[in-house]
Amino acid sequence: MDFAMSAKAIDYRTRLSDFMTEHVFGAEADYDDYRRAAGPADHTAPPIIEELKTKAKDRGLWNLFLSAESGLTNLEYAPLAEMTGWSMEIAPEALNCAAPDTGNMEILHMFGTEQQRAQWLRPLLDGKIRSAFSMTEPAVASSDARNIETTISRDGADYVINGRKWWTSGAADPRCKILIVMGRTNPDAAAHQQQSMVLVPIDTPGVTIVRSTPVFGWQDRHGHCEIDYHNVRVPATNLLGEEGSGFAIAQARLGPGRIHHCMRALGAAERALALMVNRVRNRVAFGRPLAEQGVVQQAIAQSRNEIDQARLLCEKAAWTIDQHGNKEARHLVAMIKAVAPRVACDVIDRAIQVHGAAGVSDDTPLARLYGWHRAMRIFDGPDEVHLRSIARAELSREKSTFAAAVT
């Protein structure tokens, strides 16, 4: 098991580092000014985003997440995803590596027909449109996908969709043109073969965006939408994959995507730690620099330990997917999804505490980062679901020779 960076990954890291320091960090003030002036109800992209996308393309820093485009493995891409986490609202989109588009592009690449790829994947890869993934429902516990109630009924040459979704991330962005909707097509089939996915253009009659739901009172720019689907009719050719394959497609989508999310979370944690260290070097309390206070040193050391431990676990998951596939890595992916967001929350929380009142204000990115990563402990499966999966795997594991000898 070797996590050393390849020459290709090192080259990308160098170029991405230069891009971040020369263009991305300096663009954050422009981005924030635009958002502040536009107001929370406005979901348009600040012009600086398109400028950065052009620069990223020119530098070959585009679609790095998709191996078919970049040639990078999951392990090679992981540290690059972490780097983008230092500027979570700008860097991933500037590189066309932002969720939910990344997962949607992956499943279109894996399961889409030639026509579907030409119509939707190509514009997404070119950064001309955006997309959303519509799976979670307000009326049921959607952490168990078998509960999904939205129906996708065959009617001649069409499918008709009825149901209500929420937390459909990305649907409020005016550039969002396509929704990937998961619903029940085969109610009499086995539990994990009842669901399917269909491609729904966002302007299809019957699609109504009810609202964009705030996260801890903050409206994300791309929105997290509650959507009503009422007799939404799309051609049967809009089926993604096969009928009954929705659950399998969702699992294929979430494997690498969770690694991307978790590595970005560690990038955000690194930024919080950097802010913490800078703060304690420059503040004095009770006649001594904060950096000399034992409790502060403990917070810094604990944060470094946790970030590095979580990173190694993420790298192991990425390596396992590369070597053995998503199925073999599923428990490792569950582990990182339970670990990385909590680590990020804990590190950011310590940084907030060190900053005092400034930490909960908009003068630093810490409050925003905390809100996002606390939400991350719920989306893509709550902690409890992943911990349940890990525990069940451990309980079903055959005893090792040593375990058998001592138990």
UniProtKB/Swiss-Prot annotation:
Enzyme superclass (EC): oxidoreductase
Pfam families hit by this protein: Acyl-CoA_dh_1 (PF00441), Acyl-CoA_dh_M (PF02770)
Entry EC no(s): 1.3.99.-
Any single biological process term in GO: fatty acid beta-oxidation using acyl-CoA dehydrogenase
Keywords: FAD, Flavoprotein, Oxidoreductase
Catalytic activity, as annotated: a 2,3-saturated acyl-CoA + A = a 2,3-dehydroacyl-CoA + AH2
Any one of the GO CC terms: plasma membrane
Entry superkingdom: Bacteria
Cofactor: FAD
Gene Ontology molecular functions: acyl-CoA dehydrogenase activity; flavin adenine dinucleotide binding
Family: Belongs to the acyl-CoA dehydrogenase family.
Protein name in the entry: Probable acyl-CoA dehydrogenase FadE2
